[in-house]
A protein has these predicted regions:
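Catalytic Walker B motif of ABC-type/P-loop ATPase nucleotide-binding domains
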Residues: 520-524
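Conserved ABC ATPase "signature" region
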Residues: 459-491, 539-542
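Conserved ABC transporter NBD signature motif
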Residues: 407-415, 427
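Helix-to-loop junction immediately C-terminal to a conserved catalytic motif
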Residues: 399
């Protein structure tokens, strides 16, 4: 509600601006709106998705040059002549070309990671810039002039005041669609890209698909901004679509807050106004022409990254009275009688998983050496061993995070070696992690509902236009039910990063249960828990076992393990040294020497 109130106030102020401000300032607001649209795409791509791009300006150029060419050229090529040209055809074809380009470029560059990804965006950004500069049909360095204004039902938007409303209406729609997307099943998958990709894949999220969604969406925003720019200016040349402008867009995102929708508007506004002012003032101070504003912006970004890495929007929020401050995401959650379909679990005693001579080598280090184990439905199996024995490595191979160097992993009768973890999750395996993998800035409820990702069906467009509300409510209620089941029902809207470590481990269990798996892998679930919490966890696992779920756990608390599990497998130096009932393991001489410190 508070976000909607801020939106209403901003919309009112923006709507009145052309009536109250001189033409020059309205023109400046038009540039702010167009820049903010590009930066909004960077909020999705860089701030939320964690993918840095220096090439957004080139995507703006695709939209601008497409509409300019179609609007100005009198004799269009045969394959385009049937369209008749014009601004609206330019918008349509510009979006098609942009989406095709984004799919092509994204398919090549989004597989890169680390510093290679931004270097890749620089490469294709420069390539597109020189394409615009050297193609004679596009005017070369001289550009394209006499671009006609946009017409709506015969009404020409031939002044800055008239263009103002179209620019800001499109920006407003883009902001609403972005907000809707981020507060959805697809949006949570996107938000997991930054720091949670292994977890997301293990929950069934196709992270490459999510990256492509973000990249294409941000490219579409940039292309529309280019379309607006061309018809607002009536003239374009390659200069605004080069690497320098790509860097400027990133700076705007950082300035306002790269992870905030409102930060896109704030960053674009402050940068655009400051640049204009500095370009007028600094030459008078220093004498002569020069890009002095670049020095100021460089100093600003250094100070900002030290004092407010979240950008100026977060600082502005802190200045508001407490009652008006936005308190994170509060998802709409209403009781419902509808529930998610639950796949039938295999019958008790059915063999769920087998590991056959599984070996994992990292160079010359053998982490797992011909490991064998199996687990059946309705059974709790413990995998124990000293630190460094290779237990978590084994977990990663069973769940698809790693691929065995040799040997086979059989899950429900299917060999799963080399299958991505998201595909194994579809078969009915869910897991937690030795080192907790949560999204700390998201609420507990949002973190847990990621586990139900595979149980939802609605996609990007349904999310943007809020056609997914019924399914979304069912998913959220499933997450709420699992949180109540594990004892975290009172923390639904608490930021996950604010929970104690033990509670975060319980959160991971709730998230895994949201997938309704037939096999649950728990990596040190009792670490950090107090006695009563361990007792509650044991009761939960026993109940899950009685329902037919197979549970494989790694744990160092021997009292917890020996009083809970049906069988135990013991590892040392990557090998299995013992397997049997808890009583037998407790009295096994090899285990006592290797793991429990020798015979008493």
């Amino acid at each position: 509600m508070k976000s909607n109130a801020i939106l209403a106030v901003v919309v009112l102020l923006v709507a009145l601006s052309p009536l109250l401000l001189p033409t020059y300032q309205v023109t400046l607001l038009n540039y702010i709106g167009m820049n903010a649209l590009v930066v909004l795409g960077l909020v999705l791509l860089t701030g939320v998705g964690g993918m840095t791009s220096f090439g957004q300006a080139a995507l703006v150029g695709i939209g601008a040059y497409t509409t300019a060419y179609l609007s100005v050229t009198e004799q269009l090529p045969t394959f385009l002549a049937w369209t008749g040209g014009g601004p609206w055809v330019g918008l349509f074809l510009g979006l098609i070309i942009t989406i095709f380009s984004a799919l092509l470029v994204g398919g090549l560059t989004l597989k890169l990671s680390g510093h290679y990804l931004p270097l890749g965006t620089i490469a294709w950004g420069i390539s597109l810039y020189y394409f615009f500069s050297t193609i004679p049909t596009l005017g070369g360095h001289s550009g394209i002039a006499n671009i006609p204004s946009i017409e709506i039902a015969g009404y020409a938007l031939d002044t800055n005041n008239k263009m103002f409303y179209l620019i800001w209406l499109i920006l407003l729609i883009a902001m609403i669609l972005t907000r809707n997307l981020l507060n959805s099943r697809e949006g949570r998958a996107i938000r997991a890209l930054k720091g949670g990709q292994i977890m997301a894949e293990s929950m069934g999220v196709n992270t490459f698909r999510s990256k492509m969604i973000v990249f294409v969406t941000s490219s579409v925003f940039a292309s529309i901004a280019g379309w607006l720019y061309a018809h607002n200016q009536s003239f374009i040349n390659p200069t605004p679509f080069g690497l320098q402008m790509g860097i400027d867009y990133l700076f705007m995102a950082l300035l306002g807050g790269v992870g905030s929708i409102w930060g896109a508007v704030v960053g674009a506004g402050i940068f655009t106004m400051m640049r204009q002012w500095l370009q007028d003032v600094l030459p008078m101070i220093f004498g002569g022409e020069g890009n002095y504003e670049t020095i100021v912006f460089g100093l600003m970004i250094v100070v900002l990254m030290q004092k407010s890495p979240a950008g100026l929007w977060s600082l502005l929020l802190k200045l508001l009275p407490t009652r008006y401050q936005l308190k994170g995401s509060h998802l709409s959650l209403t009781p419902t009688s509808h529930t998610l379909a639950k796949p039938t679990l295999p019958a008790h005693g059915t063999e769920i998983l087998q590991a056959l001579d599984v070996t994992k080598a990292f160079g010359g280090l053998i982490a797992n050496n011909q490991m064998n184990l199996n687990i059946r439905a309705g059974e709790i199996l413990a995998l124990i061993g000293p630190n460094g024995a290779g237990k978590s490595t084994m977990f990663n191979q069973l769940s698809g995070v790693d691929t065995p160097t040799s040997g086979d992993v059989i899950f429900l009768g299917q060999r799963i070696n080399g299958i991505p973890s998201r595909e194994i999750a579809k078969l009915g395996l869910s897991r937690t992690f030795q080192h907790v993998k949560i999204l700390p800035e998201m609420t507990v409820l949002e973190n847990v509902v990621i586990g139900a990702h595979l149980r939802g069906q609605r996609g990007v467009f349904a999310s943007m236009f809020r056609l997914d509300r019924e399914e979304e409510n069912i998913l959220l209620n499933e997450a709420k039910q699992q949180l109540e089941r594990v004892g975290l029902g009172e923390y639904l809207y608490t930021e996950a990063g604010a929970l104690a470590l033990g509670q975060q481990r319980i959160l991971e269990i709730a998230r895994a249960l949201c997938a309704h798996p037939c096999l649950l892998l728990l990596d040190e679930p009792a670490a950090g828990l107090r006695l009563k919490e361990k007792q509650a966890l044991a009761e939960l696992l026993i109940k899950l076992k009685s329902e037919g779920m197979a549970i494989l756990l790694v744990e160092h608390d021997m009292d917890f393990v020996m009083n809970l599990v049906d069988r135990v497998v013991v590892m040392e130096f990557g090998q299995k040294i013992a397997e049997g009932l808890p009583y037998d393991i407790q009295n096994d001489q090899a285990v006592l020497e290797a793991y429990l410190g020798g015979a008493a």
